Design a protein with these regions (language model features):
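Alpha-helical transmembrane segments and their immediate juxtamembrane cytosolic regions
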Residues: 1-371
Length: 371
């Protein structure tokens, strides 16, 4: 039951992230600009909570990566060779998909015809690129750290530095020192939606909680994880209260305030861990959850890619954003988001049915062969 609870906790966090992602992307893409009023409290509230999507995804990705990769051999931690190869393959796939979603179609038949603006979009750092690079760092730390306490400390230090250091790294003119392929990972000025600092911090934080879980007794892991989530949320919210007035005095608003500055990221991390604690305690009380939840977790990458193609289009198709260039009323946008979400969950259900039937067929074939 313990292992089941722990997995359910992670599955629910992923499901929350998926729902926030689909809702946020769809409404943002199809809602008319005239309703995106920055002076509206309701719009500001929606915008802020939309900003929790990436932290949920990144945090759960870091947590799941360490749980699936690092094996506890008593006093020593190991990364099995097979697991390392699979994780490296996963990292490369994430990176290729991330760039593939922004690839100019002309690149396939006439690269010289690709305008500079299209190349700029191709090179921006998006969620999958940041996840892949962060997971590579997480893997390297795990490979060179053999003790549980050292692994935990390493991830905590990495998370803290990443969340705090962004105000120092953002003003640097990386474009004058680094190639076009690299500097978008370090500055929002390149048009990147996410940068390594501070967003890798959420993955490192997830990895830290996962590393801590390696030391917990198996029969009490979910409860102790939930307790740690609660403590982390309280510390993060206190840091938000402390950092917010300080950075107003000493940090100039040089860039998108809601993405780069530490206080806001402490607030977001505090909310993510608060929800994680609530989900953790809930998983200890509820014995059965809908089977669709773990399926959503397993198919989160597929959902990410397919829903982006539906909403924003891709090099091979047009999306809702192109079909509705003028946008729609917010209520209509919400209804469209519900439809897209329903389609994605229907796709997940179909995938699970296919996998189940394939396994059943394989079992029948193997049984017949061995008779």
């Amino acid at each position: 039951m313990e292992n089941k609870n722990r997995l359910v906790l992670l599955d629910i966090l992923r499901a929350i992230g998926v729902m926030l992602m689909i809702e946020g992307h769809t409404i943002d893409a199809v809602m008319s600009p005239i309703y995106k009023d920055g002076s509206s409290i309701l719009f500001q509230f929606w915008t802020f909570f939309r900003g929790l999507t990436a932290p949920f995804f990144f945090f759960s990705a870091g947590f799941a990566f360490v749980i699936a990769t690092v094996k506890d051999k008593g006093e020593v931690l190991t990364v099995p060779a097979r697991a390392m190869k699979r994780r490296l393959r996963r990292i490369i796939v994430l990176l290729l998909i991330g760039y593939g979603l922004h690839m100019p179609l002309q690149m396939f038949y006439d690269p010289s015809a690709v305008p500079q603006s299209a190349w700029d979009i191709f090179f921006i750092a998006d969620a999958l690129q940041i996840i892949s690079l962060s997971l590579l760092v997480i893997l390297l730390i795990a490979l060179f750290t053999k003790k549980k306490e050292n692994l935990l400390k390493s991830y905590i230090i990495a998370a803290s530095l990443s969340l705090i250091i962004a105000p120092l790294t953002e003003p640097i003119k990386w474009e004058t020192y680094l190639p076009h392929l690299v500097y978008p990972y370090l500055t929002f000025r390149a048009g990147s939606f996410f940068t390594f600092f501070p967003f890798s911090g959420y993955l490192f934080a997830g990895a830290a909680f996962s590393a801590a879980a390696l030391s917990f007794p198996a029969n009490d892991r979910a409860r102790l994880l939930s307790k740690n989530f609660k403590r982390a949320s309280m510390v993060s919210l206190i840091l938000f209260v402390l950092f917010f007035p300080i950075q107003l005095l000493f940090v100039s608003p040089y860039v998108d305030y809601w993405r780069a500055l530490p206080a806001v990221n402490f607030l977001r991390f505090g909310l993510v861990t608060s929800i994680a604690a609530l989900v953790g305690y809930l998983s200890l009380q509820v014995t059965r959850f809908p089977k669709i939840l773990p399926a959503i977790g397993k198919s989160s990458l597929t959902i990410y890619v397919v829903h982006l193609m539906i909403v924003y289009g891709s090099p091979v198709n047009i999306g809702l954003a192109q079909l509705l260039p003028g946008g729609v009323h917010p209520i209509v946008a919400v209804l469209i988001a519900v439809v897209v979400m329903t389609l994605m969950f229907g796709m997940v259900y179909a995938i699970e049915v296919y996998r189940s039937r394939r396994r059943r067929l394989a079992a029948i074939i193997i049984g017949d062969v061995t008779k």
